[in-house]
Amino acid sequence: MITKTSKNAARLKRHARVRAKLSGTAERPRLNVFRSNKHIYAQIIDDVNGVTLASASTLDKDLNVESTGDTSAATKVGELVAKRAAEKGISDVVFDRGGYLYHGRVKALADAAREAGLKF
């Protein structure tokens, strides 16, 4: 019998715990991060209306990256999501790291979004 829980199951439990307390509004939407082994995705979500206001990922055609699974790609995604948020008039967000550790690609995306003008 396998008793060890997977890393993703533990991440999902952490994410659910945080999401019970954290919610995005129209005035201050939620910046959600999802990372896979090959790509990273960022969405700005209004949870009250259930609408995605802006998004960016390493799969975007606007983003010209050679490697999609490293911190430099995450930095470019952070800059792009902040630019798209600014176009929609969004400056303040709540950061939702998605149960991931604030380290590596997640930290690179957050720092780039902050430098590009998002406040959190």
Swiss-Prot record:
Gene3D superfamilies: 3.30.420.100. CDD domains: Ribosomal_L18_L5e. The keyword Chaperone applies. It holds the Pfam family Ribosomal_L18p. One of its GO terms (biological process) is translation. GO terms for cellular component: cytosolic large ribosomal subunit. GO terms for molecular function: 5S rRNA binding; structural constituent of ribosome. Keywords: Chaperone, Ribonucleoprotein, Ribosomal protein, RNA-binding, rRNA processing, rRNA-binding. Part of the 50S ribosomal subunit. Part of the 5S rRNA/L5/L18/L25 subcomplex. Contacts the 23S rRNA and 5S rRNA. Required for catalysis of RNase M5. NCBIfam families: L18_bact. Belongs to the universal ribosomal protein uL18 family. This is one of the proteins that bind and probably mediate the attachment of the 5S RNA into the large ribosomal subunit, where it forms part of the central protuberance. This is Large ribosomal subunit protein uL18. The gene is rplR.
